[in-house]
Amino acid sequence: MFVAHSLPIAICFCVVTMLGWGSWANTQKLSGKAHWPFQLVYWDYAVGVLLCTILFTFTLGSHGPAGMAALANMQTMTASFMLPALISGVIFNLSNILLVVGIDSAGMAVAFPIGVGLSLVLGTAFSYIQTPKGQPGLIFSGLALIIVAMILSSVAHRRLPKAEATNPRKGIIASILAGLVQGFFYPQLMRSISPDFSSSPILPGTLTPYVALVFFALGVFFSNLLFNTLFMRTGGVTYAEYFRGTLRLHSIGVLGGIIWMIAFSFNIIASSVAGPTISYALGQGATLIAALWGLLVWHEFRDDRAVPGNWSRSCLWAMRSAWAASRRLQDRSPALELTVYLEPPSKGEK
């Protein structure tokens, strides 16, 4: 299977994660311009996640000298390791639907910093407890700065005109709930994956990252039948509306799922080199990317009378500074140096 063998490659994968996770929600914004409800977008999103995972599993996950091919791994895995991957997909799906509700109500520039920022704090903390790599003082100092960025986003939202959000309080509450739930999915998924899969044999019963992502995607897809159906009923949306959608609208949602899953796959692959804590934290720089999309492309704070330009720019700069400082603090962790993949010595070397 395809794996990352060096720190520079792992860091590049985390950058891809950051860009993908921060950009996929643009597909929801594009669909919303056509008055396509988020509940319907999310069906196509789940399809995109599943299709991308299957494609990666039988291409990147089945070729290469490292680890174990996907089909062979499926024959040796046990339920005790498969179930955590499936459950992590269910947990993530609930949290992500709540985040989509937050984006739909409060905008990307607000929902992402609150929801994903809170998820980052919890997910990084739980990942560190599960796999303690790095200096906790530096890591948690970085997380404290991320909390500052979340607070600044909430403060900026109070200056947002009411016309910019359909239900701002609902959006903030949904984003907070999304962050609280989403913080648990990443450590849950890592429980199912064989440790050090890029440089060590796959442990009996455990899953390769590609197979784990298949069950994660299945958890997302099938839990959607419950979670999204409930959101459809509360929102007055019917399945008939979904099937009346155009090919373009469905394609946009599928594209969003593919973008998100590509980013997540690269993050999991990088985790063997950088460690789950660092990999997850670096990838969640997506919050800044999403805020930039919301502010600079979708102009979510465009009313200068309610949100003076200097104020919005100051908040954005402060958010960027907090995120950059947190990244620097986390990057200084020696775990990044200790977990670099080293080629095994040849037979003639000691």
Predicted feature residues:
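Polytopic alpha-helical membrane proteins, predominantly small-molecule transporters/carriers
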Residues: M1-Y341
